[in-house]
Amino acid sequence: MEYNEYEPEPQYVEDDDDEEITQEDAWAVISAYFEEKGLVRQQLDSFDEFIQNTMQEIVDESADIEIRPESQHNPGHQSDFAETIYKISFGQIYLSKPMMTESDGETATLFPKAARLRNLTYSAPLYVDVTKRVIKKGHDGEEVTETQDFTKVFIGKVPIMLRSSYCTLFQNSEKDLTELGECPYDQGGYFIINGSEKVLIAQEKMSTNHVYVFKKRQPNKYAYVGEVRSMAENQNRPPSTMFVRMLARASAKGGSSGQYIRCTLPYIRTEIPIIIVFRALGFVADKDILEHICYDFADTQMMELLRPSLEEAFVIQNQLVALDYIGKRGATVGVTKEKRIKYARDILQKEMLPHVGIGEHCETKKAYYFGYIIHRLLLCALGRRPEDDRDHYGNKRLDLAGPLLGGLFRMLFRKLTRDVRSYVQKCVDNGKEVNLQFAIKAKTITSGLKYSLATGNWGQANAAGTRAGVSQVLNRLTYASTLSHLRRLNSPIGREGKLAKPRQLHNSQWGMMCPAETPEGQACGLVKNLALMVYITVGSAAYPILEFLEEWGTENFEEISPSVIPQATKIFVNGMWVGVHRDPDMLVKTLRRLRRRVDVNTEVGVVRDIRLKELRIYTDYGRCSRPLFIVDNQKLLIKKRDIYALQQRESAEEDGWHHLVAKGFIEYIDTEEEETTMISMTISDLVQARLRPEEAYTENYTHCEIHPSLILGVCASIIPFPDHNQSPRNTYQSAMGKQAMGIYVTNYQFRMDTLAYVLYYPQKPLVTTRAMEHLHFRQLPAGINAIVAISCYSGYNQEDSVIMNQSSIDRGFFRSLFFRSYRDEEKKMGTLVKEDFGRPDRGSTMGMRHGSYDKLDDDGLAPPGTRVSGEDVIIGKTTPISQDEAQGQSSRYTRRDHSISLRHSETGMVDQVLLTTNADGLRFVKVRVRSVRIPQIGDKFSSRHGQKGTVGMTYTQEDMPWTIEGVTPDIIVNPHAIPSRMTIGQLIECIMGKVAAHMGKEGDATPFTDVTVDNISKALHKCGYQMRGFERMYNGHTGRPLTAMIFLGPTYYQRLKHMVDDKIHSRGRGPVQILTRQPAEGRSRDGGLRFGEMERDCMIAHGAAHFLKERLFDQSDAYRVHVCEVCGLIAIANLKKNSFECRGCKNKTDIVQVYIPYACKLLFQELMSMAIAPRMLTKHLKSAKGRQ
């Protein structure tokens, strides 16, 4: 559609079809989005791109393996051919659905459920066509080629992301999923490695091929630095960074050095003056060089800044000398001049700015681009434009599963080809037949990918440059915590650096990152979460754009003289300068029009920078973008009839979201393009701007937000009225919502998760937000609507504790189940010996625990329904003792115990036992123990507003206050929790909940809507209550009315996973560490409680010397040691024979016994091992005593 077709229409009554849409209609559009995309689309699309395109590209770009036999010199034997060349090349790759091979060699389709239960890896086999060519060159110069094709050679297994297009669950209906034992609400987006679910966390990085100019903080050698991290589009090398630096005015000697500009080149040790680089590229005359930097000779200020650099390079006046100057500073020293010049040429061609081109004739392009970097540096130095912002989100790219796995696969495939090469070379040299089946080690790729996904160390094992924590175990506490984990991203900045800048919320993150959801503490602001409607681009090829630009009048460098550049607009595609254009306005309009018609990929970003006279087009991967309504002429292009058509659809498949994008009602805008748009916040703002243009911000809105509440992420979208809370409270709730108990998946009965928490009676909240329906929070809730009173009652709810109604608890209020799984397998200990499940026999088994073995069946497993308590054995397992070992021990033992017992602090029921075989065909078992957790004093609860509290007291219903209607609260919260924390959202939620309960419908608490407290109060008054939610209550102990009115109503509360039963810990005597003989640490090891430095200081301040000695010495690690009085070192003591001596002093009499901490004795002996003698002198103490 053309832009000029729209005349301003006459003001008549609008037709029903052309009616404007309302904010309510926007939710139909949002529903269409989530129906089509789901919540982890960014993971799935990225992985699909890797499987469908990247892998084949990596195989294609690997060069053929070429092998020439090393000539064996056989004097009498004349060979038939002058030489033989072997060539091996890889072709098409094939990937099947995920398969598994049983230990007996049978293959079968693998389903995720089986992979989880049997600890298998959910991966698909990868095959590739290999061609082997043998070229034999005769003595007469003719060639004979034998070609042999191997089709579908197995080269490894690739882990498959669940719900991606190669997964067995892809596009299954709800019914099919349920039959496969999968949860229909599970979004996929993770891998299963050895039975555990792994997520790839998106990694943030600076964008490549982008010129940044930064001002250095003085004092510094440099005033300004321009940098570009250059990386060719389809290349597998690390980016080569080029710096162009302007030296600061005053040099170290105090003299003025002039502002020289120098640049770094890869593999060159020192910085090279820029003019020399230009001359080495073949631009010798000063005029030519300046034309490529300044473009406009009338700009005297800029020319002046370049004068020192020209003078510095005055000595070098032709290309060869310049190349030699560079070559001399290269890595190799002492080669001939020709070699040096060739080396410098190669570096300039292949290593400097590789994204501009690494071919033969890129000198002009390179010179222009290099000049552009300097031009930007000078603009900044002259103060004509500000320095770049490192933290701007347009300058960031996200590495998702696709690029991460791509880099890994590329590395492993290279390794594979190297191995093939060395194997074939060996075969050829020894005159063996080349068998490709043996040459290709499939284990390289299989175990490489598996290792990285399993450990999270990205890169080879123990190599430098590996990133840790890229892959993490999927958090399965609550459904919301799972979703949030799949949408998380990480900035690889050291957590130690106390830099505030990268952690702060940047304006450009609006709508891309959630402003509330980030952890507290050292990772604050570095770990972020995606907002709800973000889409991360997967990247598309740049060549359609380049062709389009060529057709639409872009002039490239060969066609123009540098003097036209200041008038024209520079055009960049993915950071590469491709030319200039005289009519950028038309070009941008055309590009956008094509993008809205989907003739150009919808994820292409078009940025027109008017001040810099640049047009930047991006097609690369990893940019954050989000959908917006398109506005034309202050009207939305989407009309009521389109919404109506959307609501009338029969099924989700037919024209939904993608249809709206294709029709040009909605487009994706990335962070950088967002800077060039004018976005209206709500649809009503747009209407206001049309009705009262004089009051409007602008006459030309270009886009409109679909809904402002979509700037929040998964966890913050669950908070009601977050716009009425102080911001840190929303951050706290985002963290706590991930620890709430609910139902984390619907198939939890069939899963054997290590830890699982399930609430008995979860309820959907009375007060909801519109985003919840897309997060499935109503189907899988994590909390209960409790009747909450805000009041002081008895004083047992001080300091963030709450009083709970014991009668409600007895009725099942907040009761929950806790599952823990134990696993064990029969490992092979060599060829014949293997472990065995079975009930150990006290007579013949050594090393048996002191726990009870009675709960075990004959197969060595506790049957389901058995009640077990601390240290009961639940899996019995023994290994045979080898003969030579048995000789030393008493001969009656034939086996050794390797059983697994319940954790000593837990009790419960055996819930389920799974006995199966793992990938190696060995038997292995998982036992799930279930325990019921009833709320008790000390358990932690929280509302949805970051108001966490522990239970301080439980009162029965008779002791709780009650209203005239006979309502008693379930929870009483202290009023002091409200004023300083300013969580007004909780109060509004409470009265809204009261109205909702009365009218029997959900209250809407979506942020940034026009719901006001007054409206809710009026509705509450209509229901016959005091309008602000206060009620008259009666004291439960005395029955007299309480003097104050009490604020009471339903509030949604969450039970958090921190329970007192899991934390309670005390110890008298117990286990000690072997090395220091001090008490062990931690509840799991039954450890002691540390009396730390601060406690010690308090005791010193009190002057409680005896208590201090008791804590730090008698109760910790008292140790008796014998000391020689002569030298003060530890003496030899034999208490059985009652003989003592110090051999160094030949002293057997003057020996005293002292008590010191064992840790101190250890330190002394460690010092002795370093030839330092700490002497414990007791003599003068003794003499001092004698004098008294």
From Swiss-Prot:
PROSITE patterns: RNA_POL_BETA. It is found in: Nucleus. SUPFAM superfamilies: beta and beta-prime subunits of DNA dependent RNA-polymerase (SSF64484). It catalyses: RNA(n) + a ribonucleoside 5'-triphosphate = RNA(n+1) + diphosphate. Residues 879-892 have a biased composition (Polar residues). Zn(2+) binds at C1124, C1127, C1142, C1145. One of its GO terms (cellular component) is mitochondrion. Residues 852-871, 877-897 are annotated as: Disordered. Disruption phenotype: Defect in seed production due to female gametophyte developmental arrest. GO terms for molecular function: DNA binding; DNA-directed RNA polymerase activity; ribonucleoside binding; zinc ion binding. InterPro entries: DNA-dir_RNA_pol_su2, DNA-dir_RNAP_su2_dom, DNA-dir_RNAP_su2_hyb_sf, RNA_pol_bsu_CS, RNA_pol_bsu_protrusion, RNA_pol_Rpb2_2, RNA_pol_Rpb2_2_sf, RNA_pol_Rpb2_3. A zinc finger (C4-type) spans 1124-1145. Its EC number is 2.7.7.6. Keywords: DNA-directed RNA polymerase, Magnesium, Metal-binding, Nucleotidyltransferase, Nucleus, Transcription, Transferase, Zinc, Zinc-finger. Mg(2+) binds at D800. One of its GO terms (biological process) is miRNA processing. Belongs to the RNA polymerase beta chain family. Component of the RNA polymerase II complex consisting of at least 12 subunits. DNA-dependent RNA polymerase catalyzes the transcription of DNA into RNA using the four ribonucleoside triphosphates as substrates. Second largest component of RNA polymerase II which synthesizes mRNA precursors and many functional non-coding RNAs. Proposed to contribute to the polymerase catalytic activity and forms the polymerase active center together with the largest subunit. Pol II is the central component of the basal RNA polymerase II transcription machinery. It is composed of mobile elements that move relative to each other. The binding of ribonucleoside triphosphate to the RNA polymerase II transcribing complex probably involves a two-step mechanism. The initial binding seems to occur at the entry (E) site and involves a magnesium ion coordinated by three conserved aspartate residues of the two largest RNA Pol II subunits. This is DNA-directed RNA polymerase II subunit 2.
